Design a protein with these regions (language model features):
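Non-catalytic, polymerase-adjacent accessory regions of viral genome-replication enzymes
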Residues: 1-42
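Conserved residues at beta->alpha junctions
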Residues: 7, 81-82, 229
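Short helix/loop capping segments that flank catalytic or ligand/cofactor-binding pockets
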Residues: 16, 87-88, 144-146
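Short alpha-helical scaffolding segments that buttress acidic/His motifs in well-ordered protein cores
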Residues: 16-20, 90, 167-172
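Active-site substrate-recognition loop segments, prototypically the cytochrome P450 B′-helix/B-C loop
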Residues: 27, 31-101, 110
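Conserved polymerase palm-domain catalytic core
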Residues: 51-66, 70, 105-106, 110-230
Length: 231
């Protein structure tokens, strides 16, 4: 069975819908709330599924919002519509299942059963084992600079389904709506949608594998990487 059929299965779509409803969240550019989403899907489910299957579905741009960071700056988020969040979640679920089997044990961000506390616990274990030197790596503006072609190339190694990859690319290129103006997204994965966190882990898994290949001790949470050594 092709991955797109797994994504579009009733069970997977229902699971994705329930996840989006449970997370609540703001509406996107179309103004449709999570509370209104169920009725919309019931009326349009067949049309939505058909358009996703035959590649005619067009995601709406994300709505740009900013949230304050601890350093006084603001973090840009992109809020997809409630429907697009559901579709993204439906894509993210089976892709996460595929990659969970190959992701590094030292990657802790946005993975089921893992948290920042686990990443901190791993770092403390390194210190207790005598690793006194620490290098903290924060990949500057990582989410804004992800190369779309490179990401699709990496995904293709495990996702052998052109319809699914085409849909993911559409979400990467969906654009951003800010102050009434739509801007194209040439690079990056806007933070705020279920797909962005999965794609970021897939992209950075190459870094994890390189660190492991070099025999380095590390822990990674999203785009924050901590490496340790004795000297």
């Amino acid at each position: 069975m092709e991955l797109i059929e797994v994504i579009l299965s009733k069970e997977n779509l229902n699971r994705a819908y329930k996840k989006v409803v449970a997370n609540k969240g703001a509406s996107g550019v179309d103004g449709v709330t999570v509370e209104e989403l169920g009725d919309y899907i019931r009326k349009n489910r067949e049309k939505i599924v058909t358009s996703l299957r035959n590649r005619t579905y067009i995601p709406k741009p994300v709505r740009r919002v900013y949230i304050p960071k601890d350093n006084g700056k603001k973090r840009p988020l992109g809020i997809p519509t409630a429907l697009d969040r559901t579709i993204q979640q439906a894509i993210a679920q089976p892709i996460s299942d595929i990659y969970e089997e190959i992701f590094s044990d030292y990657s802790y961000g946005f993975r089921a059963g893992r948290s920042c506390h686990d990443a901190i616990r791993q770092a403390l274990e390194y210190l207790n084992d005598g690793y006194e030197w620490v290098v903290d790596i924060d990949i500057e503006q990582f989410f804004d600079k992800v190369n779309h072609d490179k990401l699709i190339q990496i995904l293709r190694e495990q996702v052998n389904d052109s319809t699914t990859l085409n849909l993911i690319r559409k979400y990467l290129k969906a654009g951003v709506m800010e102050n009434g103006l739509e801007k194209a997204t040439i690079t990056g994965v806007p933070q705020g949608g279920p797909l962005s966190v999965v794609c970021s882990n897939v992209y950075l898994d190459k870094l994890d594998k390189e660190l492991e290949h070099r025999g380095l001790r590390f822990t990674r949470y999203a785009d924050d990487v901590l490496t340790v050594s004795y000297t």
